C-alpha cells in the first residue's frame, strides 16, 4: 500500500479511539506506506460541526428515549435516505476537496458520516479508493451501509449475519472485533498493576469511566458503590474533566478512614490498560470501545443505565453471552455487585465468558486484512 487515510468523527470518543488504534497498529506492523488519520468534522463548516456534535450530546443527555426512537426509525429508513447525506456533503466541502486531491489507495472509516461521503465520491467517479468501514459497536445499524463496494469490519458473528441479510457479500465482511489500542493485547499481572498505581491488594477494585456520566449521575453511582458490603476500592477515571476530578476528590476525602470501601480519583491517564488489568469489574456506559477494553482483560462489565439505541444493543450482546450485568436503578448497584461476589461460580463463569469474547488484537487484525486486500488486484 502507498497511501491510507483513516477517517473518523468526534461524536463520542469511541470513533476517534478506534481510528487511533488502527493507526497505531499500522505503525507497529512496520508498514512503510503513508498512513494519515483525520477527523472529518475538522473539514466541515463550523456551524455543521457544532450542530453535528451538540445535537447528539444534547439528545442523549436530555431526551434519551427520543434518541432511541430516532435511532430505531433511522434503521427502517436509512437505505432510502437522500436528504441527510446530501446535507452532509453540502457542509463538508473541504473534506471532499481533501479526498479528491489526496486520492488515497485505501480509506478506512470508523464513523458512517465520512463513509457515506466517500461512497458518493466513488459512485460519481471522483475518487478511486478501496473503502473499508470499521463498525465501532457490537450491533450493526443500517446507517453504516454504503451503496458502493466496501469491506466491512464488524465486532461479532451476529453483525456479519445482519450485513449478509442486507445483501453484503460474505467475502466483503471480516469479523475482527472492535479495534482498541494494541496495548490491551499485552498481558499484565493484576497485582503488579495494583502496586504500580498504589491500589489495594486486600480488596476488589472497581474501575469507573466517570467521564461518561453526567455530574449528578456520578454522585449517585459513587454513593451506591460506597455501600458495598465487600472491601473495595473504587477507581474513578475522570479524563480531562478537572471539575469532575475535583468533585470526586472531595467525595473521596469524605469517606471515613475506617471504611471498607475507598475511593480514588484519576485524571487524564494513558494507562487505562493498566488500570483495567488491575481491576475486577468495569462499571460504565456500554460503548463498544469501553466494553471491548474490559473484555480484553476478562473483566465483567457492569452496565449502568444504557441509553436506548447503540448502548442498549451493546449491553444486550454482552448480557446474552453472560459477560455483563445490568443496573437500571442506581440505588441497588452495590447490591447487584455484592450478589455476584457472593456467587463465586457465576463470577468465574462470567470472567471466562469475557475472555472468550475478547479480541484484543482487533486493530492488528484489521491492518493485516487491509494489507491482504490491497495485494489483490482490483
Where would I find each of the regions flagged by the language model?
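Active-site and donor-binding regions of nucleotide-sugar-utilizing enzymes
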Residues: 18, 69-167, 172-175, 181
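Conserved N-terminal ligand/cofactor-binding loop architecture of enzyme catalytic domains
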Residues: 21-102
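A nucleotide-sugar donor-handling region in carbohydrate enzymes
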Residues: 150-212, 240
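Donor-nucleotide binding loops and adjacent catalytic segments primarily
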Residues: 191-192, 199-278, 312
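A donor-sugar binding/catalytic signature common to diverse glycosyltransferases
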Residues: 275-313
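C-terminal "capping" alpha-helix adjacent to the active site of nucleotide-linked donor transferases
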Residues: 321, 329-346
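A short, well-ordered alpha-helix in the C-terminal region of glycosyltransferases
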Residues: 346-360
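C-terminal alpha-helical cap of glycosyltransferases
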Residues: 359-378
Amino acid at each position: 500500500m502507498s497511501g491510507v487515510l483513516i477517517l473518523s468523527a468526534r461524536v463520542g470518543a469511541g470513533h476517534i479511539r478506534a481510528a487511533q488504534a488502527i493507526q497505531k497498529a499500522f505503525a507497529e506492523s512496520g508498514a512503510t506506506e503513508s498512513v494519515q488519520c483525520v477527523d472529518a468534522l475538522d473539514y466541515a463548516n463550523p456551524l455543521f460541526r457544532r450542530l453535528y456534535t451538540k445535537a447528539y450530546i444534547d439528545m442523549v443527555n436530555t431526551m434519551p428515549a427520543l434518541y432511541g426512537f430516532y435511532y430505531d426509525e433511522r434503521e427502517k429508513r436509512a437505505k432510502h435516505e437522500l436528504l441527510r447525506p446530501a446535507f452532509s456533503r453540502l457542509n463538508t466541502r473541504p473534506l471532499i476537496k481533501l479526498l479528491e486531491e489526496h486520492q488515497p489507495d485505501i480509506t478506512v472509516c470508523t464513523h458512517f458520516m465520512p463513509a457515506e461521503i466517500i461512497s458518493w465520491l466513488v459512485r460519481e467517479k471522483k475518487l478511486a479508493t478501496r473503502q473499508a468501514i470499521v463498525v465501532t459497536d457490537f450491533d450493526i445499524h443500517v446507517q453504516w451501509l454504503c451503496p458502493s463496494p466496501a469491506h466491512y469490519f464488524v465486532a461479532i458473528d451476529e453483525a456479519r449475519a445482519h450485513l449478509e441479510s442486507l445483501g453484503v457479500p460474505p467475502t466483503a465482511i471480516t469479523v475482527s472485533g472492535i479495534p482498541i489500542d494494541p496495548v490491551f493485547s499485552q498481558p499484565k499481572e493484576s497485582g503488579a498493576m495494583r502496586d504500580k498505581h498504589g491500589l489495594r491488594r486486600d480488596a476488589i477494585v472497581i474501575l469507573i469511566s466517570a467521564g461518561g456520566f453526567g455530574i449528578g449521575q456520578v454522585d449517585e453511582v459513587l454513593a451506591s458503590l460506597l455501600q458495598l458490603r465487600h472491601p473495595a476500592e473504587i477507581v474513578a477515571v475522570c479524563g480531562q474533566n478537572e471539575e469532575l476530578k475535583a468533585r470526586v476528590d472531595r467525595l473521596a476525602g469524605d469517606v471515613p478512614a475506617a471504611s471498607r470501601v475507598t475511593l480514588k480519583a484519576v485524571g487524564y491517564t494513558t494507562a487505562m490498560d493498566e488500570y483495567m488489568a488491575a481491576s475486577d469489574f468495569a462499571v460504565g456506559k456500554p460503548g463498544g470501545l469501553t466494553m471491548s477494553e474490559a473484555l480484553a482483560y476478562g473483566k465483567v462489565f457492569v452496565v449502568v443505565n444504557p441509553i436506548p439505541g447503540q448502548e442498549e444493543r451493546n449491553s444486550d450482546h454482552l448480557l446474552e453471552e453472560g459477560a455483563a450485568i445490568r443496573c437500571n436503578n442506581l440505588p441497588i448497584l452495590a447490591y447487584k455487585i455484592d450478589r455476584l461476589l457472593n456467587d463465586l461460580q457465576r463470577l468465574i463463569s462470567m470472567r471466562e465468558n469475557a475472555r472468550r469474547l475478547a479480541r484484543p488484537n482487533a486493530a492488528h487484525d484489521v491492518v493485516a486484512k487491509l494489507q491482504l486486500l490491497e495485494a489483490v488486484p482490483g
